[in-house]
Amino acid sequence: MHLIINKKRKGDEMEERIWDNSTISCFQTCRRKYYYQYVRHLRPKVKGTALLFGSAVHDALDVYYKNADREQGAVLAIAKFKEVYSTPEGDFLRTVENGVKLLTHYFLKYKHEPFTVVGKPEEGFVFPIGSILYGGRLDLPVEWDGQLWIMEHKTTSRLTSSYFNQYELDKQPTGYIIALEEFAGRKCSGCIINVLEPWKEVKRVTAKTKQPGDHFLRKPLTRSEELKDRFRYNVQAIVRDIKWCEEHDEYQEAEKKEACFYYNRNCPFMQLCQYGENDRIIKRDYVVEKWIPFENAMRKEG
């Protein structure tokens, strides 16, 4: 069920298209990638292992936090993980067994959570920013010591002290914080990044070997009113640029390592940028899958 926030103001001309973080971030990364992914609606036939594993963990945590009985929730969550995920060939880290181990130790470490869940996990939202609609999903809204927070689940294969730096100015948490404030009608203190790191058993344990509980970390991030205002402005500016590109059918390639090679893997559309839009390659390696966030959402008129 989608959470539709009814905040339309009189006189506003609201467009029906819903913009989200995935669309906007993709355009900022590379306009050509945006063209392939959101104009031509191409998706690689083979999805990345990290993405599949992270998605399965998200599904499991969604089941876990929806259940008031945590012990029962843990059993159902692990069953859900096994249902939606299978071990990819050649990956010895993101296996079903390691995923079950990861979730089991997560439930042990956070057996007694210091917060209560507000509403439902993975609730969808849509709210206006100027004349556009912005949408997404909230992983886990929580009440902690009388304060409202949004918790965002992340998985990583390398959890270091610098891991959280990437989220200090990231738009995604900022959008979640604003969305929760719009929905709740009260201040959201910030976004808690909840990180889970899968691990393989080591053959020789040393003093530096992580204990199971060390594979989980949380960090609260806050956003000033200035940053939230800047988010609103930037989202509208980026959407304006996207519309210009769509109107003029012009999408430049970024052609820089940060866009073409990231997280130790090639951009899924690299070969199309190298060799052109070859129909044979497209038919072989991609599927057409249109991205329409909240297609069935009904927006209330104010």
Go through each PLM region and give its residues.
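RecB-family 4Fe-4S metal-dependent nuclease core
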Residues: 1-302
